[in-house]
A protein has these predicted regions:
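Active-site entrance/lid segments in N-terminal catalytic domains of soluble metabolic enzymes
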Residues: 1-132
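Conserved active-site-proximal phosphate/metal-binding subdomains
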Residues: 120-134, 140-183
Length: 183
């Protein structure tokens, strides 16, 4: 977030109190808005959904499920809700449910939730909804970002691109292999 993007804490399968600790650490490092990603199939999703509100997190991204049951809780707390979608139908459903933004995630993403490529999915979703669309999947540099913007996305999401960053908790051997990779 300090660099100008919206930093996201990946809750993954972390215990709820670990997520709370990470949120508090993030607050110590920035006064900028940041979000938490919640995998909704995770058994801790409900607890983490509440922690987001209790800790005053400004945004939540969701995957692996429908955030509908948490929408009222988050919206009443002023949390921006940003679900990840892999189809036009899901994007429309999330817009009707009250999402503020959708992430159109193509098959190139680490989450690989659909069978449509990012560059094919983004313009379809942009044309189908009236809320902002963020492109995700296979975007690793300015060229991918520019392409997403040309297709109507208002932002991009990158994840794998940051695996080798100093902030990543991935093992150093893995980071080194990523850095050395040619293709």
């Amino acid at each position: 977030s300090n660099a100008g993007g919206l930093g996201i804490i990946g809750a993954a399968s972390a215990p709820p109190e670990v997520v709370r600790e990470e949120i508090r650490k993030c607050k110590e490092l920035t006064d900028k808005p940041f979000g938490v990603n919640i995998m909704l199939l995770n058994p801790n999703a409900e607890d983490v959904a509440k922690i987001v509100v209790e800790e005053g997190v400004k945004a939540v991204t969701t995957g692996a499920g429908n955030p509908g049951k948490f929408m009222e809780l988050w919206k009443n707390a002023g949390v921006k809700v940003i679900p990840v979608v892999a189809s036009v139908a899901m994007a429309k459903m999330m817009e009707r449910a009250g999402a503020d933004v959708v992430v159109a995630e193509g098959m190139e993403s680490g989450g690989h939730i659909g069978s449509t490529t990012t560059m094919a999915l983004v313009p379809q979703v942009v044309d189908a909804v009236s809320i902002p669309v963020i492109a995700a999947g296979g975007i690793a540099d300015g060229r991918g970002m520019a392409a997403a913007f040309m297709l109507g996305a208002e932002g991009i999401q990158m994840g794998t691109r940051f695996v080798a960053s100093k902030e990543s908790i991935v093992h150093e051997n893995y980071k080194n292999q990523i850095i050395k990779a040619k293709d």
